[in-house]
Amino acid sequence: MKFIIKLFPEIMIKSESVRKRFVKILTGNIRNVLNKYDDTVAVVKHWDYIEVRSKNIENRTLLVELLGRIPGIHHFLEVEEKPFVTLHDIFEQTLSDVATQIENKTFCVRVKRKGKHDFSSLDAERYIGGGLNQAVASAKVQLSKPDVTVRIDIENDKMMLIKARHQGIGGYPIGTQEDVLSLISGGFDSGVSSYMLIRRGSRVHYCFFNLGGATHEIGVKQMAYHIWKRFSGSHKVRFVAINFEQVVAEILEKVDNGQMGVVLKRMMVRAASKVAQRFGIQAIVTGEALGQVSSQTLTNLRLIDEVAESLVLRPLITHDKEQIIAKAKEIGTEDIAKSMPEFCGAISKSPTVKAVKEKIEQEESYFDFSVLESAVQNAQYLDIRQIAEQTKKEVSEVDEITVLSANEVILDIRSPEEVDDKPLEISGQNIILMPFYKLSSHFAELDQSKNYVLYCERGVMSKLQALYLREKGFDNVKVLNKIS
C-alpha cells in the first residue's frame, strides 16, 4: 500500500533551503503520527513529494483518515505501483484495473510523466485511452467532465495507477513556526482559533482560566485533547489550568459593573503573558472577532493588548459567527462548544463598548493584584498526553468494569470514523452509538432507568465524559475498562 503526499503549494515556492527544512519537518510529523498506529509504515521524502508505504492493507482507512488531518499536506494520492517495459504494458495493466470502473460510463485518461521515454504524456493518454475505448465497448471517451478520470503517473520504469485522491487540510507543518499559547474556554471561537494556528505551523499549547468549577474544566479538557489528538498529535503540548474564581470574585466586589468585561480580559492576558514567558512562547492566541461582543470593539481590544507582554494573535478577527460555527463543525468541536456555558459574558450586565483607559486603570487600582499573582503561581501544568492519567485519579468514584451484565447498555462514544474502522461487536450486548461530543446534549434523552457503560479505544474520553456526567447529576454511568 502506497501513498504519494503532495505538499501545500506555499511550501513549494519557498527558497530551496526553507523548502527542504519544511519537507524534513513534515516527513518527521507524518512518521510520528502514523507509527503510533502502524509500525510497518515507512516515510521517505523526495524533492517535491513524500512517499508513505505500509505493509498492513487492513490499516488503509485509518491511514487515510490520519493523513487527512496532518498540517502541511495539500492532498495525497492512493496509488498502486507496477513496473513496465513498453507503453502497451501500461495499457494492459491499466485495463485490468479499471475495466469494470468505466463500464457504461464516460472516461478520460490523464498521464504525468518523469524520466526518459520514447513517448510523451500526450502519446500515452491517446494510446491508453484508445485501447480502453476499444476494449470496453460500453465505455465512451469524453475529455470534458467525464464520469471517470483514469490518472497515471509514470516515472522511469514504473507506473503508478492512482486509485484515489484525498484532500488534506493544507497549511504549514507543525514546528515550522514558533510556539503559541491559546486561551481556550471551550467555546466555538477558542477551539477554531487554536486549530487555525495549528494549521499555520505552530505548536499550540493551551491555557484555561477556570471560572465554572470542575464541570467547566472537564469540558475544556475534552476540547483541547480532541483538537490535539486530531490535528497535532505529532508534538507534545502543555495544558495549563489557572483557577480564576477568586480573580472573578475580586472583580465583582471592587470593579464598576460596566468595566468588568475589559478588566477581566486584561487580567487573563496578564496571566497568560506570564505563562508564555515561562516557557519561551512567542505569542498568545485568542478567539476574539471584531464587534462580536462588547469587549471586542477596537477601543477595548487596544486596551486589553496594552497589558500584554507577548504578541496577541486573533485569527478570527474578521470572521462572522456563522463562519466560526461552520468551521467548528468541520473540525469536530461544535457539539462540545454547544454544551459550554459562556462564563465571561455573565459577570457584567451593562458592559462598556468604548472603555476609557483612565477609567479602567482607576478601577484596577482597587483590585488586589496578589490574588492574580496567587492564581498564576498555583497554576496546574499538564502534558496533554497525561490527561488520561490525571482523569483516572479524578474519576476514582466512577466504577470501572471489565465484565458486562445483561442489563447494562454500552455507549460507544468514539467518533463515527473510529466506529467504522473498528466496529465494537459483543454478542448479546446492547450497544448504542453516541459520539462523545453529543453526550452532553443527548444523554438525558436516554432511558435513565438503565445503567450505561461508556467505551472508547484508549479510555481517555470515556473517563472524562463519565466525570462530566456525574457532575451533571447522572449516577448511572460506568466506564468499560477492558472488553471481556
UniProtKB/Swiss-Prot annotation:
GO terms for cellular component: cytosol. Disulfide bonds join C344-C456. It is found in: Cytoplasm. Its main location: cytoplasm. Its EC number is 2.8.1.4. Residues 404-484 form the Rhodanese domain. It is an enzyme of class 2 (transferase). It comes from the Bacteria. Keywords: ATP-binding, Cytoplasm, Disulfide bond, Nucleotide-binding, Redox-active center, RNA-binding, Thiamine biosynthesis, Transferase, tRNA-binding. The active site is at C456. It catalyses: [ThiI sulfur-carrier protein]-S-sulfanyl-L-cysteine + a uridine in tRNA + 2 reduced [2Fe-2S]-[ferredoxin] + ATP + H(+) = [ThiI sulfur-carrier protein]-L-cysteine + a 4-thiouridine in tRNA + 2 oxidized [2Fe-2S]-[ferredoxin] + AMP + diphosphate; [ThiS sulfur-carrier protein]-C-terminal Gly-Gly-AMP + S-sulfanyl-L-cysteinyl-[cysteine desulfurase] + AH2 = [ThiS sulfur-carrier protein]-C-terminal-Gly-aminoethanethioate + L-cysteinyl-[cysteine desulfurase] + A + AMP + 2 H(+). Pathway: Cofactor biosynthesis; thiamine diphosphate biosynthesis. Coiled coil: none annotated. NCBIfam families: ThiI_C_thiazole (TIGR04271), tRNA uracil 4-sulfurtransferase ThiI (TIGR00342). This is tRNA sulfurtransferase. The gene is thiI.
